[in-house]
Amino acid sequence: MTTMIGQTRQAGSSSYEQAWQAEQAPCPGMEPDTLTVGVVVVTRNPTFFQTGLSVLNDIRDYVFNRVHIQSELPLKLSELASDPLYSEAREKAIHFLKNQSKALNIQVIQCASLAEATGKIIYTHALEQQPEFQMGMLFYDQTSLGNVDDSIEKIDRDLDAFYSAMQRGGIPAFYTTFSTVTFIRDVRSSFRYLPQQYREIVRSEDPAIFQTELLCLWMDFFEMNYTNRRVKPIGALALHNTLAEQLIQFFERTAASRWLVSYYTGSIISNLIGYLDRHAEAHGALVLRGPNEHAIACGAMANWQLYRMPFLGVVTSGMMDEFKGTLINLKETAAQGIIVAAENRNNQWYSFQGTQTPTEDMRDVLAAKRIPYVYIDDVDGIADGLAEVFRLYHQAQGPVVILATQNVLESTLSLEPVPGDLPPVSGLPAYDCPPISDSFEQAMALINEGPEKLVWQLGPVSDDEYALVHEIADAAGLALVDSLAHPGSAPKYYQGKRNPHYLGTLAIYGYSPRVYNFLHTNDKLNPMSDQSVFMIKSRVAQITTPFSDGRLERKVHLVQLTHDERHLSPYADLKLHMDCLTFLRAVKANLHVDAALREKRKALIAAYLDSPSDVVSQLPSLPMSANYFFCQLNRVIENLIKTENFDFTGVYDVGRCGISAVRNVAKTRRGFSGWYGRALMGDALLATSYLAHTSPTHVVAFIGDGAKGIVPDILPAFIDNILTHPQLLNKSITIFYFCNGGLSVINTYQERILFNRTSRQMRLVNVDQPAFEQTVDDFHIQGKTLTHFDEDTIRHALMTPKRLNLFSVVLGHNNEGDGISLATAKGWQRDPSDREALQERKDWAARQPESTSTSFDQGQNKEAIS
């Protein structure tokens, strides 16, 4: 050990100070710099500090004009290890330093904590009035502070506080990823991610490696900060971004409440995203991330359908296609949002990732899909371009795409807010005085005087609309059904109580046996004079019923309500081109249902069995059947609803088990279905990580192994959102992954409809997932495989807040039940629906009090128990 060259004095009982001044410029032609760059070393380890001093001392003759050191540890030099790699790095460093024009003044400050360093720098700066001092590099030795390393998020927060204190104190700082490094004990396990405020390195026990790392870190800082004229010591000052600022202002003005921001980054959009990350939430945005661009569309669609939350999505060049068919789903659901996509200039020749070339043009694709877009390729055109974007946005026909070039995306031009408020619209009919058309009068005649069986299938009704529907159903004796595309639009439980009007699900797949029996007698559709089906907020798309075109045209009396004239169906016997809320208020105002008719209708609803209608749903075979698992799960969930006021938002992916969940598991509110629109496997799974943060209730997702395998793992992005928004997760999020090793719906089509054997095309390979548990802050994540129905585990998982449950449920395949086709409605396991049995149940229903909310099977069970 040798004493460092220069004058050394002990400044106090526990501190040391030393200054060294070069007698001449370190290298010919170098001029002394008037600035002093601070180097802060936070450590309690003498070896760490002294090795760092020795490395600086080893190159002092080639860069330093003056060195001033203040420390709590003794000022000694360690003998550096002889190592060829270190020697090579030193030679390259000296060669680089000799070519610099200025010699550097540095002030080394060693402290035992970050807080002490903050105080010392601010105090010294104020006391000595060093206007030319700039905070340079920070070495943060976690290995000498406490017994374990702090979490990444805590270190990020502490460092952000340090640099913010520098800024408040008027101390310039080089604040880049090269200016701050933290040394930790070992590579982080469980989950890892890139820190935002620093570089992270494991402290090597090998002296040669450690000293080489210190030299490389210093030289990286020197090259990328001090010698780079583009990098200024301005601290954490955020750069301006024109486009991001204008979009934030627009959504703040126009969004009713929260609005959603989501992005998948790229080089030329990173400045825009950085501005959104820093400023959007202060103006009402919720910034969430997904694992890819496709997830942005899925999260936007789910949050628009359920909560009418507008969105802003940002993607880089060439990524418009990554939205897949979900982009069309966004248009079909008329989701209001803006998508910013990077694009090349027209005069670029086959730009990297560009989609405007001599052989393709993304604008033609968007036009073919009838998705409006605005191409902005000049900074001077930002205001006019955004004005057109905002005009298109207010047409409420789906998302609007901004195709913007790099100069536009990175512009820092100051602009006045571009006008974008909703223009006044005149001539809209008042809700309390709707025009009474012949079609409306015919619809009211059906409601007031019509058949005893009146079924309303609800589309994407809002909470206010459903409240009116429920009131009308009670006054008129209506039967309510939901659909595969909009599960829970008519819930089985409403405001914590059993919904007496709810009949089940009517859809192309997954129709309930209770709905089938209600509409059929002896497996034949009831006469059109005996029943009518109202489709509310519906296009009468193929997914809404199991009936063929011929049956819809000749066998089903259909009343359709839609606000969009383009959606009026050729199969509707009565077409109502009206706004839904206007229609419902008009119906309520014109209700005159005879009490006897109302009670007959209610008695009929109660007379039909509420049952899975198959034997295997009660049979605990191994592997479990989907029928059995969902029957047991429904039993648990209904019990929780009744006893614990359990409320949840269901998420249903495309596949047999998504169908089973819609059909068999009780719902308390509207959920999100991947079956909507293009029916894309994986949409629901990707939407789950967004709904976890926006849903006001617990979230339960039903995902097949096919859907799981077709999209990325959502867990990493989920954890990223936990770190950013932990306050939004005081709920349980449960994802059931159903693993039966095959594409079941296709299997059933082959085996039950075409009478073929299954084949390789339907095979899926399930790889066993080991159980795990992980805690992120105070949020718990668990993964577990279920081969049996574990009621205690599931019940606890569903009710425990601040928890993500990932259950892999092992199931077998069968073709039984679940309304996969009308053929399955006639199997030997079905409950009897003959006239005598039905008459018995109708007689029972007629004897019940008017306020009853039980169905026949529940009443029979009570009588048997008594």
Swiss-Prot record:
Keywords: Antibiotic biosynthesis, Thiamine pyrophosphate, Transferase
Source superkingdom: Bacteria
Pathway of action: Antibiotic biosynthesis; prodigiosin biosynthesis
Biased composition (Polar residues): 849-866
Top EC class, one word: transferase
Family matches, as Gene3D superfamilies: 3.40.50.970, TPP-binding domain (3.40.50.1220)
Ranges of Basic and acidic residues composition bias in the record: 828-845
One example GO MF annotation: transketolase or transaldolase activity
Catalysed reactions, semicolon-separated: (2E)-octenal + pyruvate + H(+) = (S)-3-acetyloctanal + CO2
GO biological process, one term: antibiotic biosynthetic process
The EC number(s) this enzyme carries: 2.2.1.12
Swiss-Prot/TrEMBL cofactor(s): thiamine diphosphate
UniProt entry tagged with the keyword Transferase: yes
Region (Disordered): 826-866
Observed effect of gene inactivation: Cells lacking this gene show a white phenotype and produce 4-hydroxy-2,2'-bipyrrole-5-carbaldehyde (HBC), 4- methoxy-2,2'-bipyrrole-5-carbaldehyde (MBC) and 4-hydroxy-2,2'-bipyrrole-5-methanol (HBM).
Protein role: Involved in the biosynthesis of 2-methyl-3-n-amyl-pyrrole (MAP), one of the terminal products involved in the biosynthesis of the red antibiotic prodigiosin (Pig). Catalyzes the decarboxylation of pyruvate, followed by the modification of the resulting two-carbon fragment acetaldehyde at the C3 position of the 2-octenal (1,2-addition of acetaldehyde) giving 3-acetyloctanal.
Entry similarity comment: Belongs to the TPP enzyme family.
Name of this chain's protein: Thiamine diphosphate dependent-3-acetyloctanal synthase PigD
